[in-house]
Every structure is written in structure tokens, then in C-alpha cells.
Amino acid sequence: MSLVRLAHELPIEAPRTAWLDSIIKGDCVAALERLPDHSVDVIFADPPYNLQLGGDLHRPDQSMVSAVDDHWDQFESFQAYDAFTRAWLMACRRVLKPNGTIWVIGSYHNIFRVGSQLQDLGFWLLNDVIWRKTNPMPNFRGRRFQNAHETLIWASRDQKGKGYTFNYEAMKAANDDVQMRSDWLFPICTGSERLKDENGDKVHPTQKPEALLARIMMASSKPGDVILDPFFGSGTTGAVAKRLGRHFVGIEREQSYIDAATARIDAVEPLGKAELTVMTGKRAEPRVAFTSVLEAGLLRPGTVLCDERRRFAAIVRADGTLAANGEAGSIHRIGAKVQGFDACNGWTFWHYEENGALKPIDALRKVIRDQMAVAGA
């Protein structure tokens, strides 16, 4: 089955089955009208940079530098570029889920104008991320600093966009248990990853490295999420999404790019479920009520709980509360009360005895969560 859908053949707000895991051929704003409201989880946008190039650029050996001079990167004025930017961002905001996020990448030529439009339209900026290139192109004329980075803006749909995905624990673990910083070091796309045509020329002038897209998706999405790329180009977003178990929808108007992206995505082998399991922190784990521990038979009413040093004790009641010193309440309230504190995490404070050893009741909560995970698999 072909990946390609023609924008004008899709109905307005087409059903998910009509566009999921496909490339929609057409203008990005018109094509976005074909997607329903709140239908995508993450957007990655690599829009035209509106490069202000003044003539040809040559290396010291007089060979010409292959720069971005395609017609799709040409705008009559900054005002025209701003109008274009506002139009596609408005269309993207409509299809983004309330808890979704958008990534936009750009250079110094355009990223500040894009950032201003994002804020004006109600997006809420979460981070700017610097992609530092290990192998940037030199500044051949020697009139400026070497431009060795691009900037990504990461934003939620609006200020109240709570519940967006950020796989903090996974990013930290992947970074040797140190918080992932907002400056990322990757080489530009070269070697076998760089798509070439039959003449050995680059298929796309600004092909992004798969490692960059992989980090974005691993940080801000989950397996099964829908990733939209309104400027699909050579299909890096689709290829990485397929490999990482995400769905994608790309929008592209240039047939040569569509052909290259289609062949590229068709060749991708998705990773298995075990490789795609995302490490999560406690905040992302399902809530478990203490009464569930009793209902599962892991503790019985009348069991005496204590702290790890056996200074305080409480009795488990049949209704899932604890009783101590004439007071009754939740595991958290009674834990705080016996210590004279304002708050307490009862799961880690209270312990039960098993084979002569004290264990935190949090271990029983883990048993319940494991059962929930199996039931939901």
C-alpha cells in the first residue's frame, strides 16, 4: 500500500485511517485542514529558513558551496515570511492535542521570528535547545564567526498544557544519571545516512540527522503516539518514528522528496517492544490506593505496621485506614501525626514484618502496579 495521499483527495478533517503513517502531498496549510482537531501528539517542524543569501558562495579552492537556494526557501519579504509562519503554526495548533508539544528547528535567519509567532499564538515555551554540530561548515569568507549550531524551540500547546510527555528519567539515565542539558552535540548528516540521487548529489539540502530526531521522540513521546512533520522533506521524521514504534504523518509538496522519503521509510525495520520500553519516574506510575493492598490480600486488617526503627506503630483497619494513639486516617495522615509533622509519605514510612524482617509497604504497592501492568499488556 502506498504511503502517499493527495491532499485534495482527502476530506476535510479526514478520519485517522485515511492519513495515519502516510505522506500527504500538498501545501502544508491546506493539507493540515485534512486532519481533525487534536489528532497529533507531537509536531516536529523544520520550516524554510528564509536564508538571506547574496550570490554564490565559494570555498578557498574556488569550488562552489552547495547552499540552500531552492524556490521553497524564497520569500519576498520578512512580512511575507511572518504571514507564512503564522498560517502554518495556527494550523498546527488546531491539530495538536491539548497535552501535545511542538518542536521547531531553525537558524539565526528565522528562529527568532518563529519564536515570536509561537508566543503570539498562545504556545508556551518549555525549552530552547542548542544543536551543536561536531562538523559544521566553515565560514569561508572569514567575515563572521563560524555558524556551528541550530536552535530548537520546544513548546506546549498553551500555558495550561499540563500532562505533556517528558521522559525525564529515561533522558537522565541515558546521560549517565545526570540531568540532560539543553545543548546537544551531534554531527550534521553525512556518510551513508545522507540520501543521494543517481548523480551522487544530495537529495535534500537540509537533511537532519536521525540521532537528533530520535532524541526528540524519546524525550517527548511514547510508543504509539502520532508525530506530525509539516515539512517532511527526505522523511527523517517518518523513518525514525517507524523505527521507534511511533505513528507519523508527513506533509510534503515536492515529488522528488516524497519519492526519496517513501523508499527510505519502506526500508525501516521497527524495533521490538522490549527495546522500546521507556523508563519512567514515580510520578508517571499509576496511582494505587492503600485499600487495594488489602483487597489483594497482601495485608490483613489487624496487621500492625511500624516505622523502620520501630518507634511508632499503627493498626491496619478493614476500611483501608490506620489507627494510632486514638486517631484514624490515611497512611500519610497517621504517619505525619505520630511524628508531629505536617506531611508524610506513608508508603515509605510504614513497614510490615515478613520472616522477621521489616519491609516498606511500598513493596506491596509495587506488586499491585506489576499486576496492573500485566493486565494492561
Swiss-Prot record:
One of its GO terms (biological process) is DNA replication. Residues 271-373 form the RAMA domain. Its EC number is 2.1.1.72. The keyword NAD does not apply. Gene3D superfamilies: Vaccinia Virus protein VP39. CcrM-mediated methylation has important cellular functions. Contributes to the accurate cell-cycle control of DNA replication and cellular morphology. Belongs to the N(4)/N(6)-methyltransferase family. This is DNA methyltransferase CcrM. It comes from Brucella anthropi (strain ATCC 49188 / DSM 6882 / CCUG 24695 / JCM 21032 / LMG 3331 / NBRC 15819 / NCTC 12168 / Alc 37) (Ochrobactrum anthropi). The gene is ccrM.
